[in-house]
Amino acid sequence: MNKREVMKVENLVRNYKMVYSNRQDEEEIKVLKGLDFTIEEQEFVGIMGKSGCGKTTLLKGLGLIDKPTSGKIFFTGKDASELWSDELADIRRREIGFVFQDFYLLNSLSVKENIMLPMVLDKAPVDKCYKNVEAYAENFGLSHLLEKQPYEVSGGEKQRVAICRALINNPDLILADVN
């Protein structure tokens, strides 16, 4: 049985230009060099490497946050380079779950509101939001923390909150940039 293709990468290249204040020239740093791969539904893929080797750059590309220098990224068959910025934002909000190294929890929101945020942005019914948050909080051992602010919980608890937030909309793809 063939599985559905979620992500396809063709000849992905990402370079950065480094401009130095004490020099007249600029240097091009080649981070990703011609990557090709496919990710199918229900497939787990791990990307490992030394610090600074391009793992986060790759995840930002796969998450449609950063555009490649060249090459193609297809998400569920759609060529990301042909999509408008609002279409990319919709895909990121509805179909891709992110867990970042720094979590990016909003301290002005409670743990519950942070988990619920993707559903609220997607204009999901309020009762569904609360039901889903409570279910995820229960599964991840966070129920007792729902009314707390992110700055009141431990690093491990923040990571679990970020994971719940990434899963809450049942995305097609989950990207986790963790140490």
Stretches with model-predicted labels:
Residues 48-50:
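The feature captures the beta-strand-to-loop junction immediately N-terminal to the Walker
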Residues 109-117:
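Short coil-to-helix segment of the ABC ATPase nucleotide-binding domain corresponding to the Q-loop/switch region
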Residues 71-79:
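Conserved ABC transporter NBD signature motif
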Residues 63:
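Helix-to-loop junction immediately C-terminal to a conserved catalytic motif
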Residues 149-153, 157:
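Conserved ABC ATPase signature
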Residues 174-177:
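Catalytic Walker B motif of ABC-type/P-loop ATPase nucleotide-binding domains
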Residues 170:
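Conserved catalytic motifs of ABC-family nucleotide-binding domains
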